[in-house]
From Swiss-Prot:
Organism lineage string: Bacteria, Bacillati, Bacillota, Bacilli, Bacillales
Keyword S-adenosyl-L-methionine belongs to the record: no
Membrane spanning residue stretches: none
Task of the protein: A master regulator required for the expression of late competence genes including comC, comE, comG and the bdbDC operon. Receives signals from SrfA, and possibly other regulatory COM genes, and transduces these signals to the late COM genes. Represses transcription of rok. May repress expression of a few genes.
Protein name: Competence transcription factor
UniProt organism field: Bacillus subtilis (strain 168)
GO MF annotation terms: DNA binding
Biological processes per GO annotation: establishment of competence for transformation
Gene: comK
């Protein structure tokens, strides 16, 4: 993994190569350390700002994605979020997103994780690199499983495995009557 030594970037959007967005203090200011498959670099934005910007880049906002997670899973504390549904980019926070120490991990890039001697978690990423994160093993495991559940629920919806709810469709009374009449005729025609 190469280390970029250039000046920090001013902005960034999470993408398929993003492994983690972690807080890093630079000159007394919280910035972000971006870990991608092949490189590490810094951005002059807080991790949550990058996550929100990335959600907006893909047509929503952090608040919108957080609300979407709640609608699907009822997870409200440290919810994982879907940044980009078309590219299967799901992130989960290491702590409460309101805390400046909160980092974000890309679910798809987590290959293995284990507890360390001091109750942190050592994570092996898809690029083969390992990193120790200041999060307990149980908390990290919980975040991984909750994100997997969110991914599965969204994928089921995308694959149409969840029945569509017809009550959201509003039709004028005449059309409803005709639809019911047509349905009855079809059912009777199939039976007789």
């Amino acid at each position: 993994m190469s280390q970029k030594t250039d000046a920090p970037l001013e902005s960034y959007e999470v993408n398929g190569a993003t492994i983690a967005v972690l807080p890093e203090e630079i000159d007394g200011k919280i910035c972000s350390k971006i870990i991608e498959k092949d490189c590490v670099f810094y951005v002059n934005m807080k991790p949550l700002q990058i996550v929100d910007r990335s959600c907006r880049f893909f047509g929503s906002s952090y608040a919108g994605r957080k609300a979407g997670t709640y609608e699907v899973t009822k997870i409200s504390h440290k919810p994982p979020i879907m940044v980009d549904p078309s590219n299967q980019i799901f992130l989960f926070p290491t702590l409460s997103s309101t805390r400046p120490q909160c980092g974000w991990i890309s679910h798809v890039h987590v290959k293995e994780f284990k507890a360390t001697e001091f109750d942190d978690t050592e994570v092996t990423f898809s690029n083969g690199k390992t990193m120790e994160l200041p999060i307990s093993y149980n908390s990290f495991e919980n975040q991984v499983y909750r994100t997997a559940w969110l991914r599965t629920k969204f994928q089921d919806r995308i694959d149409h495995r969840v029945p569509k709810r017809q009550e959201f469709m509003l039709y004028p009374k005449e059309e409803r009557t005709k639809m019911i009449y047509d349905f009855i005729l079809r059912e009777l025609g199939e039976r007789y």
